[in-house]
Structure formats: structure tokens, C-alpha cells
């Protein structure tokens, strides 16, 4: 006989799956165990006990056995004796019924009558119970075995248990308690449109966060050790981070379908149908389980009798078991019907964390759907605490807190100080690249002046940025930064320069337009779409103190808002990435402009609107499509113009009107196709910087000597063969770039350039260097750019002096 304890194997599932079993599944499993016991008990009795006990019947009335042999004396027809050839003779004394059958004949009669005359329900009752119970068990546990559902269930249970036991769950919730116990008001994060949402502080921590009711500790007494609740070690942090990733991937995968829900529904429907079927036929056939059974079989030739009276020894017990079984099936069926009603009444393919959002500080926990929602509903039937603790790993706020903790552990103050550098403006700069957020230790660098954030998604600027009293410049490269209200208040008063680079319009935080004291704004990104231009550019009207505006994009025309802002702009720079920029007449309104840059705007002529900007001091038309600059004559009206950059164009000649720009100090004409320099150029007596490199020049006019203020001359990459002696009358020359020409010799008068600190000679046809180079007192070896073998043609004392000058500087 099978031990009762072994029957649990048929009903038990994996222990981990127990949390997916609601109370009704637990009840039905135990009912199934009892049904199995009934089946095994009944089957065991049938195997071990006599199935049927039969005796021949000597007194037969109408093919039925008379219950008493005295019936033959009763009035009426005389009984027949079909089962015997021996006629009874009256006996005056007591007598018994004797049969002349041996044991084998009795066994044979028992077997034949059991097989042919006992009702099938009484015969197979234990096996029917076993069959139906196994079907019930299969229906109840099929979803745990079916590959398409078992994989999801196994993965879900594994993640759920890890989330429940994770140290981050307890510590994150403990931080919630601390935050809600803090009397200081909480500031809500501002979104792109700077909507402010007030946040309230709860007084009853335990009531606000019921998730912690089972884990009461020192927090319950108002004592919180921040080192325990706020810091995770590296291993715990990595484990929690991995859990967040697993939950995200699992949610994406499971929410795609509802196969678990549909399979569970079908299992329940099958069990209800099975219940109805069992009740119908069992109640109908249970009365066929009888103790007395008349058996009429045609075996008279073997035993001498045809009619027998048989007893079914197990009938009474089977009837009791059948009644008990029917009651169990009814109870089982009612539970199944309740399950079906529960599934049909409730929307189980949607799960809302509304109550948890209200109870905790994690108001961003999303609702879930399909199989994910259904499994959470089942978990709630087991213990709602599981879903409440699991919700922590669905919250982006919680993930950001964990990310911040891990970030703080990785980026210590010493490590950040090692990353500090000095930029070109001699400002102390920190560049953070591809991090998950801003380490809190950054705000301990009180000496920081420039903060660069690049490729940092979903970063939030906290109020602690107010500690950076020296911060004046902020870079946001592909970083959609949010900001808290106190931080915005600080930046509004202190930030002077802002650089933003984006590929998607969503990467531009709209709170930047509330920076009332902002003086310099750099925007780099695609503004080709009309709506993008409106959203991004239109907010510039709010920046009343803006002085410098740089746009690197692909505009087809100058937006009106730029013109409106231009009333107080001092510098406007547009790098149009090669897209043709038209309709520049609105530039006339920017009367206060001192610097104008129109770079890569595909300009073919110098825009006439520029000539109305009388305050211009610097014009940069780099990398356009300029072929002629006849309009340069109009520059004479720009009396303050000191710098003109016409580099990287296709200019073939310089108009003689260039001489009218008498205030010009810097002129960039490099990377063009100029073949000749007009004498009028040298009327610009104030020129200090002249760049004519990478052109087609073959000589320098002797009038170059008129530029007595010239400090830097670049004629690199031309075809110049000789240098005019007048060049060396420019005694203020500090840098002379002569590389990649066809110079045969360097005049000895080079020694007259007493201010020379750098001379480039590489790439010429020089055979030797003049000794007079040693007469340039400020020239060092590092400032002499020449081939090594050519340098070795100098006398040893000259070389020694140049080397010594380098060492003294070092």
C-alpha cells in the first residue's frame, strides 16, 4: 500500500511556486490529496479483500433467488428447483442447506458474477476517483509545466524573491522614512516647462510606508543611522543595479502577451466543466453500489447451479466513500466557480500601484498589464507585501537613488580633483562624460568655475549646486537635465554662460530660458524642422541680459526672435553647417553688435545688411562660398572694425578698396586663391596680424615694410621664392611663418627682427641658415621650426645659444 505521505508528491509543486498559489489553489490541492487517499484506499481494499462472495440459490422464483427456503411452504404456486435435480423432502427436524461445490468452483462463480453482474460504477469506483483526481491535478499544475508559461513563472518568482530579499529594498524604503520624517520641505523636480508641484511631508512614517511594518527597527523609534540606510557597499550596489535591469527586461518581455492569464483561465474552466460532469454521473450511479447482488449466469454445466446470491463486501464502505467523495467534489467545484467568478469580475490584465504610490515617496511607479499584472494579482492573494517591495524596482526614482549611491561610492572627492583642468580661458574646469548622474562630491569642489556634463541621461541638478559659489559656466552636451527649484534659483543669479549640444529637441531643458542673468548662450543641434526652431529659439526672448549668442545648426533663414534678442546682443555667431542662409536683412536691427560670425552659411556675397552695423569690431565669414569681395568698400563705414576674417573661401583677388580700412588690425585671408597682393593693402598701417597662407602668391610686395605695427605674418604654403628686404623693416614682428614655399635663401637681415620669437622655415629649398639668426635675442630653439639637418648648418655657438634659451625658459 502507498504511504499517505507519498501522495503529497502528486499535489505539491516546486516550493518557490507557492507564492503564485492563491488560497483557493491551496484548498483544491489539499482536497485533491484527500481524493487521492480515497482512490488509493478503495483500490487497495479491492486488491486485498474479496471482491464478491456468491452462493448457489436453491429456491428460485421467476429467475430470482428466494430470500428464505421456507417460502416453498407458503400459499401459492409451488417453487421450482432449476438449480438442482434433487427434490427436497420434508424433514421434521432442523436442517441446513448443503452444497456439493468445491473451493475452485466457488472462486470461479465469484469471478464470473463479479465480472458480469456487478455494476460498473461499483466495480471501477476507486479508479474513477483516481482518474478524475489526476485530471484535476493536471489542470491545476499544467501552467507550471507548460514551457511557454513555466519559463515566465520561474523567471518572475526568481526576480521577485531577489527583490524581496535585496538590501536595497529595505534601505530605499528606510530612506523614504527619513525623508518623510524630515521637517524640511521637499522641493519637487521641475520639468521642461518648469511646472512646480508642491510636495507634502507626512507625520506618521509607519502609516505612510506600511511596507516597513514587518521590518520595524530603530527607524520605528525615530533613530536612523544614515550610514546604514544611505550607503550600500559595492557588491550590494551592483546586485541591486542588476536587479533593476532584470526587472526592466522582464517587464518588457512579459507585458507583450497574456498567455499565462489565458492558460489559467482555461484550466479553471476545464475544472468547472469536470466538476459538473462528475456530480451529474456520480449522483446518478451511486445507488448502484449494493451489498446483495443476484447473479444468473449460464454455468450450470460447470457447477450444477444457474442462479446465485452474491454479497459485495465493500459496497457499504464504497457507498460511504462515494458520498464523501461527492461532498469533496462539490466543495472543489464551488471553489473553482469562485475562482472563475473572481477572474471574470476583476480586470486582472491591469495592475495599479496607486495605493503604493500614495503610501510611499515613489509616486512614479508605473501600472503594469497583461501577464505581469495577472501574476501580481496572484501574488497579492498570497501576501501583498511581495508586490509592495517589488514595486521599489519599478520606480525610476528608486533606480536614480541607487545609481546616485553607486556613483558617490565610485567618484570620491580625491578622484574628482584629479580630473580638474585649466581651460583656454584659465578657468578651473571639470568634464564628466557618460556617467549615470552627477556625483554628490562634485558639489564639494567649491573652487570649480566650469562644469561640463556630456552624455549623462536623466540627470537632475540638485540644490547642493549652490555650494559652487564660483560656478559661472555650464555645459550640457546631449544631457537632458532636470533641475530642482532651489538649484534653479541659484543658477538664475550666478550662471553667466551656458553651452547646449543636442540631437533631439527633448535634450534641451526649457528651464534655461528662466536664467535671467545669462549673458552667453551656445546652442548646437539640428533645427531644420519648423517646430524645432519655434520651440528652441522662441524662448530667447526671455533672456534680457544675453550678450553672446552662438548657433550651430542648419537654419534656412535668421529667425525673428534672434533679431528681437539682437537689440542687446554684442556677439552673434551662426555656424550653419553648409546650409545656405538667406534673408539677412534683419541684421540691420542689431545695432549693438560688436562681433559677427557667419560661418559655413554658403554665402556668395558679403551681406549688405552688415554695413549698417556701425559698432562692429570683428567680422568672421569663414568657410563660405565667397569668390569676390567687392563689397568691402562699404566696410569703410565701419570705423570700429579691427578684425576681418575672410578665410576658407574662394577669393581670387583683393580689391584695392581694402586700403580704406585704416583701423584694421587683424586680417585673415588664408585658404583662398589669391595670386597678388595689392599695394593698397599696406595702407592699413595698424595691421598687427596678417595671414595670407595657403594661397597662390609668388612674391611679397616691397610695400610690406609700411606695416610698422605688424607682429605676426603668415605666408605659409604659397610659391614665394624670395623675401623683400623691406620685410625686415617691420621691427615689431614676433612670428614669421614662411613654411612650404620655394625660398632659396633667408636674408641675413633677419637678425634685425629683435622681437622675433618664432620663425617657420620648414618645407623650403634652403641650403643653410644665416648666422644672423643668433642676433634675435628672443628666439629659442623651440621657436625655430626647421629641418634638423638645416639647423645643424648654424655655427655651434648659435645653436648653443638657442638651446640655452630654451633651457632657461624651462
Swiss-Prot record:
GO cellular component, one term: lysosomal membrane
Annotated LRR repeat ranges: 399-422, 423-445, 447-468, 469-492, 493-515, 518-542, 543-565, 567-589, 590-613, 615-637, 639-661, 662-684, 686-707, 708-730, 732-753, 754-776, 778-801
UniProt modified residues of type Phosphoserine: 202, 217
N-acetylmethionine modification, residue list: 1
Residue(s) at site: Required for anion selectivity: 103
Glycosylation sites: 66, 83
Entry's localization field: Cell membrane; Lysosome membrane
Alphabetized UniProt keyword annotations: Acetylation, Cell membrane, Chromosomal rearrangement, Differentiation, Disulfide bond, Glycoprotein, Ion channel, Ion transport, Leucine-rich repeat, Lysosome, Membrane, Phosphoprotein, Repeat, Spermatogenesis, Transmembrane, Transmembrane helix, Transport
Activity control note: Inhibited by (4-[(2-butyl-6,7-dichloro-2-cyclopentyl-2,3-dihydro-1-oxo-1H-inden-5-yl)oxy]butanoic acid), which plugs the channel like a cork in a bottle by binding in the extracellular selectivity filter and sterically occluding ion conduction. Lipids may block conduction in closed heterohexameric channels.
Reactions that this protein is recorded to catalyse: chloride(in) = chloride(out); iodide(out) = iodide(in); taurine(out) = taurine(in); L-aspartate(out) = L-aspartate(in)
Tissue: Expressed in brain, kidney, ovary, lung, liver, heart, and fetal brain and liver. Found at high levels in bone marrow; lower levels are detected in peripheral blood cells. Expressed on T-cells as well as on B-lineage cells.
Family: Belongs to the LRRC8 family.
Domain notes: The volume-regulated anion channel (VRAC) channel forms a trimer of dimers, with symmetry mismatch between the pore-forming domain and the cytosolic LRR repeats, a topology similar to gap junction proteins. The di-leucine motif is required for lysosomal localization.
Role played: Essential component of the volume-regulated anion channel (VRAC, also named VSOAC channel), an anion channel required to maintain a constant cell volume in response to extracellular or intracellular osmotic changes. The VRAC channel conducts iodide better than chloride and can also conduct organic osmolytes like taurine. Mediates efflux of amino acids, such as aspartate and glutamate, in response to osmotic stress. LRRC8A and LRRC8D are required for the uptake of the drug cisplatin.
Disease with which this protein is associated in UniProt: Agammaglobulinemia 5, autosomal dominant: A primary immunodeficiency characterized by profoundly low or absent serum antibodies and low or absent circulating B-cells due to an early block of B-cell development. Affected individuals develop severe infections in the first years of life.
Protein name: Volume-regulated anion channel subunit LRRC8A
Organism: Homo sapiens
Upper classification of the organism: Eukaryota, Metazoa, Chordata, Craniata, Vertebrata
